[in-house]
């Protein structure tokens, strides 16, 4: 109770006191002026420096992103060119291999035809030689037979002996 009596005597705390308001306002203004002179400049400077640092980091990040995108585009273009070049080289290699294969096949075919032709010619020549040799032997045998027949009489028994001797001569020559 004593407290409430003291409050009643001095007035209420919510009653405006012009002297208190005046000195509170002057104190507030003085504190603001002191803070402005001493602390406000460094605080604002630090905030501006921090803002500039953040903006610089953001700008560098955008620059790095754009540079990375440019490098990525360049790498994609280089990769596409390399793939196109490798496809071209593979295609040219296949075309060259097909061309070489066709040339080799054609050359082998031509060579085999030449060999077959040469073999046929050689066989034909050997056949002619064999026929010539056979004709010569037959002619020789006929001449000898005629010679023996002319020397001997045309008796049947003599003819038989001449033919037998020619057959024997022919058999001995073949062996």
From Swiss-Prot:
Pfam families: ATP-synt_B (PF00430)
Bilayer disposition of the protein: Single-pass membrane protein
A single Gene Ontology CC term: proton-transporting ATP synthase complex
GO molecular function: proton-transporting ATP synthase activity, rotational mechanism; proton-transporting ATPase activity, rotational mechanism
Domain of life: Bacteria
InterPro entries per UniProt: ATP_synth_B-like_membr_sf (IPR028987), ATP_synth_b/b'su_bac/chlpt (IPR002146), ATP_synth_F0_bsu_bac (IPR005864), ATP_synthase_B_chain (IPR050059)
TM region positions: 20-40
Described purpose of this protein according to its UniProt entry: F(1)F(0) ATP synthase produces ATP from ADP in the presence of a proton or sodium gradient. F-type ATPases consist of two structural domains, F(1) containing the extramembraneous catalytic core and F(0) containing the membrane proton channel, linked together by a central stalk and a peripheral stalk. During catalysis, ATP synthesis in the catalytic domain of F(1) is coupled via a rotary mechanism of the central stalk subunits to proton translocation. Component of the F(0) channel, it forms part of the peripheral stalk, linking F(1) to F(0).
Family, per entry: Belongs to the ATPase B chain family.
Protein name, UniProt field: ATP synthase subunit b
Species in which this protein is naturally found: Chlorobium phaeovibrioides (strain DSM 265 / 1930)
